[in-house]
Amino acid sequence: MTSVTLLHTADMHNRLTAQAAEQLHEIREQNHALLLDSGDAIGALNVTVRRSEPIIELMNISGYTAMAIGNREYFFRKWGMVHKTRAAAFTILSANIQPVRGDMGHIKRWTTVTAPDGSRVGLFGLTPTMIAPGSWVERLSDMRFLPWKQAAQQAVTALRGQVDWVIALSHLGQQRDQRLLELFPQIDVILGGHSHPQITKIEELSGTLTSYPRPYAKEAVLITLGKQQDAIHYDSRVIELL
């Protein structure tokens, strides 16, 4: 049997307080959890780049493991997108954004980590398509969006054989996430964002657990998962943030 504990936030939009950052740090340590975010953490719009993003420093204090690129973290030029999260001491993920040439700096498509309990965890990010293929804006960009289904397939193929858990940090929204879990049952957990639910939603669909916290750093979701052979069981609770 293998198990892992996750602490999940999404769509914080620069609303994380110093108190809440310390609270997340304490919860993460007490529960030996991986702290993960599904994107739109920062305050900048997708068309703007600010000198700094204060929430990134607070997330460093909390001890995040990884976050997905959301539409707020996106910028149509690579330098801007890299700049927005440059201060992160944790991994930034998007499997479906690729550079026209070169690499993406500190931004990765997927990664593997060892959880505090020793289980191996594969993480990948998915970002909503911000520039339509073939559009005039695409000609100005030095990055391209892969179809999210193709990117997810590549990530699952790369990760599944080498980890105990495959976790998608998705900023696609609930409707596309539903399709994601139908297409890729190899994904154990979808930690979602972008949908801004009025009530935090945690449910198991077709054997895949999905989590959607309330936005604006109001709540986080603590999930403990266990796997024995092919059977997965979980326990979850919603935590109100200070």
What is the predicted function of each stretch?
Residues 1-242:
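Acidic, metal/ion-coordinating pockets
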